[in-house]
Amino acid sequence: MLKFQTVRGGLRLLGVRRSSSAPVASPNVRRLEYKPIKKVMVANRGEIAIRVFRACTELGIRTVAVYSEQDTGQMHRQKADEAYLIGRGLAPVQAYLHIPDIIKVAKENGVDAVHPGYGFLSERADFAQACQDAGVRFIGPSPEVVRKMGDKVEARAIAIAAGVPVVPGTDSPISSLHEAHEFSNTFGFPIIFKAAYGGGGRGMRVVHSYEELEENYTRAYSEALAAFGNGALFVEKFIEKPRHIEVQILGDQYGNILHLYERDCSIQRRHQKVVEIAPATHLDPQLRSRLTSDSVKLAKQVGYENAGTVEFLVDKHGKHYFIEVNSRLQVEHTVTEEITDVDLVHAQIHVSEGRSLPDLGLRQENIRINGCAIQCRVTTEDPARSFQPDTGRIEVFRSGEGMGIRLDNASAFQGAVISPHYDSLLVKVIAHGKDHPTAATKMSRALAEFRVRGVKTNIPFLQNVLNNQQFLAGTVDTQFIDENPELFQLRPAQNRAQKLLHYLGHVMVNGPTTPIPVNVSPSPVDPAVPVVPIGPPPAGFRDILLREGPEGFARAVRNHQGLLLMDTTFRDAHQSLLATRVRTHDLKKIAPYVAHNFNKLFSMENWGGATFDVAMRFLYECPWRRLQELRELIPNIPFQMLLRGANAVGYTNYPDNVVFKFCEVAKENGMDVFRVFDSLNYLPNMLLGMEAAGSAGGVVEAAISYTGDVADPSRTKYSLEYYMGLAEELVRAGTHILCIKDMAGLLKPAACTMLVSSLRDRFPDLPLHIHTHDTSGAGVAAMLACAQAGADVVDVAVDSMSGMTSQPSMGALVACTKGTPLDTEVPLERVFDYSEYWEGARGLYAAFDCTATMKSGNSDVYENEIPGGQYTNLHFQAHSMGLGSKFKEVKKAYVEANQMLGDLIKVTPSSKIVGDLAQFMVQNGLSRAEAEAQAEELSFPRSVVEFLQGYIGIPHGGFPEPFRSKVLKDLPRIEGRPGASLPPLNLKELEKDLIDRHGEEVTPEDVLSAAMYPDVFAQFKDFTATFGPLDSLNTRLFLQGPKIAEEFEVELERGKTLHIKALAVSDLNRAGQRQVFFELNGQLRSILVKDTQAMKEMHFHPKALKDVKGQIGAPMPGKVIDIKVAAGDKVAKGQPLCVLSAMKMETVVTSPMEGTIRKVHVTKDMTLEGDDLILEIE
């Protein structure tokens, strides 16, 4: 039954939750005077202070908190009835170790008793004595017992006297490294240093060899001094792979001692407990009996009173060794409370008031184990970085609760600031179940419910522990973490909502993250998506491809009656008109409509070329994800990509195995037709790309890049014979489809008729595909001429995305062929709806639209031969530099540069080379004659020099001489195919490097992105790791962020939608930040955003750049307590550079490389943030 006592302020529940026995005093024991406690002060902070306050409130006792200057915002001071500052002007830890201030607060405010909590002064006999001397009760053992038990060496002697087995070790604290040497000589390695006046893993260091002895002794001494105010150490033999079992004891002032069974604390890291379990699983009953009886025997030996813990190591043979007594409440007391139903803090207070254990209904025979309890300490430590403490502001805190879950929390709330000064504990989560697996399941569920944003936590690591089969079987020892490296295969939290808020806030404060060429806002009107029928889309040419393979697909195309169209709207059209900036978000919205209404298309060009790197570089999207998502939405129409031969989708040469692997993975992700070309029509490069695409199982479409005019007999370099000869080689190489790729739109109707009819006559069974641009305005006429001459497929873009430097109009071709033998079978009214969508979508990209400076196409393209996309770019660049009126000169220079380089075929990257040389000539006021005459002295653009060296292949007709020799002088020249001499890239090694850098699962697609664009990919991964899945934002939000008071939805995935409202942006704070407020799913959220413009005018410590080898950054926030090197010193890999201290833990920063110290950026006692630059090595 429950026993109550009337006290001031109400009823008091005695120190047991449930008891079947009435309170009876022990017989023949002198009764002490009962002195009720009316006011308790907790000389501690964080969750243990809150735990004691709650117990006091339940007992009707008034509570008093103390706090340091650094803890003014901490929750424990708010949970108490009164709170007082201590340690003014002292270091953070020293404030809670300042006995005079604590005693002064107690005496001045009528405190009856002081509860020490754990850590800090809890095991300091001088503190217990100071309380006693001041007439204030110390809720704990007597000062003498605290002294004996707190001095681990004396406690060891007492254990020996009581007949309790101990680990071989020193009899008293050691005071020199020499004594440590002597002990290791006697007992051998491994040995362990332990702080003589405290626990919790502080001051503990294991040493395995003489070489490690000095460094570990120094660190252990320093840690013990910082944590407990005394650096004394003792040393003992280290028992390998033991279980760490501790027994909870409770004594009163009448000599009654009982135990509350044991806890298993074997899951540790650096002797710091991580997960605690009660009772210990699979513990032999006889061993349990020996452990508990030895614990009671030891407590009686010293006349122990109040709560305490006796700790043991149990070796693999079941032999136990006494370690120490913690004469205080333990962090993990909670699990004992859960399985015994005894409130230990209540009991502590009652014992201090003079109550006996029998009075409280606490008899050994009544203490029973009920089920199993597990405690996890949720901390702001990053398991991926060796559990380094993280600091910062908690942006979101949502805990896991429910049946069987208890939370003992500290300052875990939204807006709380986690400092580097104290322990990193956020909350203790305790799960109680009928057995170990049940408790583990409840704990796992609760941790999965947690949402902590703004600081890193150890929750992913704890979840791995809870799911580990060895843990679930209950057979763990202290090496569990070290022997299970898979525990560190952490599944990163998605944290998508908070990351997106950070992005939106960043844009609201700093403007767009992608360069905006024209200051024009996106259209405020969202494009209307036409109605899409329910059900699967109708069959299309891809169904034929999947059924009959590439050869059968090619036959079907050739046998088709009527003209087939390829739609370039999803790639080349927006590359030409909108600087390749169209986002997956807008492509996905219209994709289902295309699938249902345009199944008669030959294919859709939607991938490859410039879209690949631009997606990562400027849109912060994964190009592979775009392909995957579009494939899912359009399963019936073949996809086509642009493959730059041996350059794949890059601008340089790659090892052959990279090109082959790229095509293989592209095919696996849904790519069908590979349009393979080379910017110089260099056959070896094209053949490699064709082989790679073919071996992947794709449709090979060899594309001959077109320039000149085959209908003009004066243009002899690129004659009909040239194209026919090249076509022969490509057909012989096994192409499934032959393409003429007219990048500048130079094909005139007469040339179309001549070239296509010749190809049709020569290759009657081969599908012919023609690509052009409409810069001149003659694109529709040219494509009709091609169709009439025998072409099977021509390229078009939907009307609102056609014309100018894009492809000819889809609607125009459909209308012109309707009712003729060339009928496309594409419904014209569906083209209108499709076009209307893109007209609206185009308005979202107004800042990138070529019409900002270009109002029409121009027939002068027949003279300058500038490809469509490049024509747009050059036109815009000229206007943005104030040279719009001189664009004519740029085009003239382009013609001259082309002739200087030997009259090239111009398509990326050769077109860029010509463009670079043209701009170089304009900027330097050079004519062709002047540039050629001064070729030996001029510093030409790098792209020009590398072209002349042979880096992109050999142009038709060879390199221009003597210009080439003048420019190159003695630079090396490449003979043959540029990539042929490159060794294979180790893709497995690259994957490992990516995992090491980005710390998450890396896909084959990621590996290939990194192989193609290593720097761009790294920046993309870093950006999205910070800002989340940006492709889920609509384009207006992506470019300019929301307006204040704007409400909107963001769909993360099917069935998961965020409701967001932008509320306000604050003024600038002293750290150069602005606070941005949102409402997310009805709850207030705020984030801090650095104002990049304002920070340029403020001084901050530099950050270490991840990509700069030799820049060493702080691995965690903390204080510099030792610098071991100076500028000019030579260092070896692994050599200590400096020592940081944070949260009472020290970390040695070591050199990752051999070199010389160039500069040291820190001084002793400097406080650093994470990644602050410490020093530079060269």
UniProtKB/Swiss-Prot annotation:
Domain ATP-grasp: from-to ranges: 156-353
Protein name: Pyruvate carboxylase, mitochondrial
Organism this protein belongs to: Mus musculus
Residues in coiled coil: none
GO MF entries: ATP binding; metal ion binding; pyruvate carboxylase activity
Positions carrying N6-succinyllysine: K79, K442, K988
Residues annotated to bind Mn(2+): D572, K741, H771, H773
Chief location category: mitochondrion
Catalytic machinery residues: R328
